[in-house]
């Protein structure tokens, strides 16, 4: 999720018994600047502190199989780490791909923002290839019968934007096909969420193999997250695939989870990385984690005040606090003990460093108190 950079961001672990309870001064539409806490240490920060773990990662995807945790992250051929617990120790054990992605575009050597799901007897690793700041992108998928390294088959292209077959069709003609996330319901129906900047976050249904889009995307595509008014100026890049004429909308990194009776759509909003410590964005413009919910996996998703995420809504769940800066790239891991929200963040004030400690923060939940 987010534009790939050399900066190592952090995954966090909050020692909580449920997703944290706090007040966020009310839900605010994305068009308005949020009064997100400044990252300097403040005792009144309403978010839980972090618990350190020695693990460097960006855009994490974690699954739990037979007592072992597997993490998939950006890096050459998609890195795999394993650990006996979320606390670690995490050990790099190999990669998903044995070679560069078979998709002939973008950064084929180090695909971005992988997400791995287990469905039936197969593990699916969805990934993106792109070039930073442009929407000439594609989403691919690899499969294996086991979650560890070795035995993965790269099936290549699933969807693409910018150039190539199908990129001129709706919704790919206006979107950026990165940050893939796949949800498979109890009925076996699969859905692909994707999108970064441009026209926001979209969803298309997948067929039963999870290797192809089902139906006609022109009628089946759903725009899940968007904001009409762009908060950032338009790019002046000479390549039309690298500029947004109406301005930039920093929405990306979606993830869909289910906690009966609601489907929760999580996403990241704001600037993810490449921070200048002497000129940080205004408070609330850096990454934060937002959410909306719906009774249907297809939406529409709304925040606490009933605002549609496709019209600027979004409940702030976690934002900068203490030494945590720009948390995002979030996902939810469902365990017997409850749902676990995990994410990466940049450590303040060393937000530019390439060598930093990592904190694995998990918000364990038996109830979604942030919605009360």
From Swiss-Prot:
Reaction catalyzed: Endohydrolysis of (1->5)-alpha-arabinofuranosidic linkages in (1->5)-arabinans
GO biological process annotation, one example: xylan catabolic process
GO annotation, cellular component aspect: extracellular region
Annotated Basic and acidic residues bias: 35-45
Signal sequence interval, chain numbering: 1-16
Pathway: Glycan metabolism; L-arabinan degradation
Transmembrane segments: none
GO molecular function, one term: arabinan endo-1,5-alpha-L-arabinosidase activity
Glycosylation sites: 363
Record localization: Secreted
Site (Important for catalytic activity, responsible for pKa modulation of the active site Glu and correct orientation of both the proton donor and substrate): 179
Active site: 59 (proton acceptor), 252 (proton donor)
EC number: 3.2.1.99
Region Disordered, annotated ranges: 26-52
Domain of life assignment: Eukaryota
InterPro entries documented for this protein: GH43_arabinanases (IPR050727), Glyco_hydro_43 (IPR006710), Glyco_hydro_43_endo_a_Ara-ase (IPR016840), Glyco_hydro_beta-prop_sf (IPR023296)
Keyword field: Carbohydrate metabolism, Glycoprotein, Glycosidase, Hydrolase, Polysaccharide degradation, Secreted, Signal, Xylan degradation
Protein role: Endo-1,5-alpha-L-arabinanase involved in degradation of pectin. Its preferred substrate is linear 1,5-alpha-L-arabinan.
Family: Belongs to the glycosyl hydrolase 43 family.
Name of this chain's protein: Probable arabinan endo-1,5-alpha-L-arabinosidase B
Organism of derivation: Neosartorya fischeri (strain ATCC 1020 / DSM 3700 / CBS 544.65 / FGSC A1164 / JCM 1740 / NRRL 181 / WB 181) (Aspergillus fischerianus)
């Amino acid at each position: 999720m987010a534009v790939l950079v050399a900066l190592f961001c952090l995954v966090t672990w909050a020692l909580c018994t449920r997703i944290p309870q706090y007040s966020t001064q009310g839900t605010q539409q994305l068009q308005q600047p949020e009064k997100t806490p400044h990252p300097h240490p403040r005792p009144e920060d309403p978010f839980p502190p972090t618990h350190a773990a020695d693990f460097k990662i960006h855009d994490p995807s974690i699954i739990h199989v037979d007592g072992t945790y597997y993490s998939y992250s950006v890096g050459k051929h998609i890195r795999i780490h394993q650990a006996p617990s979320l606390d670690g120790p995490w050990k790099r054990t190999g990669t998903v791909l044995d070679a560069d992605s078979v998709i002939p575009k973008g950064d084929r050597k180090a695909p971005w923002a992988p997400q791995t799901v287990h469905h039936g007897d197969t593990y699916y690793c969805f990934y993106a290839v792109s070039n930073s700041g442009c929407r000439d992108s594609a989403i691919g998928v690899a499969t294996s019968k086991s979650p560890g390294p070795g035995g993965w088959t790269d099936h290549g292209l699933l969807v693409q934007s910018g150039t190539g077959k199908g990129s001129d069709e709706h919704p790919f003609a206006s979107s950026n096909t990165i940050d893939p996330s796949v949800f498979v319901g109890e009925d076996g129906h699969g859905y692909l969420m994707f999108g970064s900047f441009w026209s926001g976050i979209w969803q298309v249904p997948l067929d039963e193999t999870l290797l192809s889009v089902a139906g006609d995307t022109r009628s089946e595509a759903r725009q899940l997250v968007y904001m009409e008014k762009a908060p950032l100026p338009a790019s002046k890049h000479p390549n039309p695939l690298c500029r947004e004429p109406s301005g930039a909308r920093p929405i990306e990194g979606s993830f869909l989870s289910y906690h009966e009776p609601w489907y929760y759509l999580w996403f990241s909003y704001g600037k993810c990385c490449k921070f200048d410590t002497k000129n940080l964005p205004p408070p609330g413009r850096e990454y934060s984690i937002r959410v909306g919910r719906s009774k249907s996996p297809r939406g529409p998703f709304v925040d606490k005040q009933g605002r549609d995420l496709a019209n600027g809504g979004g409940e702030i769940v976690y934002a900068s606090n203490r030494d945590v800066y720009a948390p995002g790239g979030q996902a939810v891991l469902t365990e017997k003990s409850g749902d676990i929200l995990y994410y990466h963040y940049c450590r303040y004030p060393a937000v530019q460093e390439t060598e930093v400690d990592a904190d694995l923060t998990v918000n364990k939940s038996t109830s979604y108190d942030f919605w009360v």
